[in-house]
Amino acid sequence: MIPELNYLKETGFLDVQAIYTAPGLHQVPEELEIQLQKQLEIAKKSAKKIIVVFGGKYCYINMRDSYRTIDTVIEEMREDGYYIARTEVENCLDMLATVDERKTLAEGQKVWFCTPGWLKYRDMVFKGWDKANANENFPQYTGGGIMLDTIGFFDDYAMEHIEEILDFSDWASIPLESRTVGLERLKDVLISAMAEEDRL
């Protein structure tokens, strides 16, 4: 969500200090936990109210302890005097479009959805993947790939990096296109995570 959150800061919707974990850590939950704890400690030095912009169900899966969730990690970081909340979504896709909205965009096809960050940071998101991993995962999406684009990222990125988009499509063996979705959903998700007295 780095491109989207930076855009909301640049356009004045967010007046926050944004601190990020590295992209793609849903594949490495131990590292995600370490980075999240570190970033929350940094955030607590400059803010009393903190929102963790992260999905719940699919973004942190601890194979060693299935009862340990992202919310468990966040709960352990709570202390008196701080408001810490997580965005109430299952994954990053839910921040940009609901399940029903994605079904509409898919038009009855089996589609792989992504956000701009998945393309921009693909080397980190798909770290350790080779063509065999891609062949195991992507061809099932017979409807191709759709990027949920809230900020015009895809067209701008294609102007300078068309080869990277084509390389990704070739590697994944599916075409990748974008669909414009508004920022309203993301704004609503962020507002819902705010302390009640701060909601617009």
Which residue ranges define each predicted feature?
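C-terminal, charge/polar-rich interaction regions
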Residues: I151-L200
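N-terminal basic/disordered segments at the start of proteins
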Residues: M1-G12
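Long, charge-dense
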Residues: I61-D123
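Glycine-rich, highly charged phosphate/nucleotide-binding loops
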Residues: P29-A43
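A conserved mid-domain beta-alpha-beta active-site/ligand-binding segment of alpha/beta enzyme cores
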Residues: R102-L166
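Structural alpha-beta junctions
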Residues: T11-Q17, K45-S46, V73-R86, E164-R179
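Gly/Ser/Thr-rich loops at beta-strand to alpha-helix junctions
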Residues: M1-P3, L25-E30, V53-R68, N91-L93, ...
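A short beta-strand-loop structural module common to alpha/beta enzyme folds
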Residues: D15-L32, S178-G182
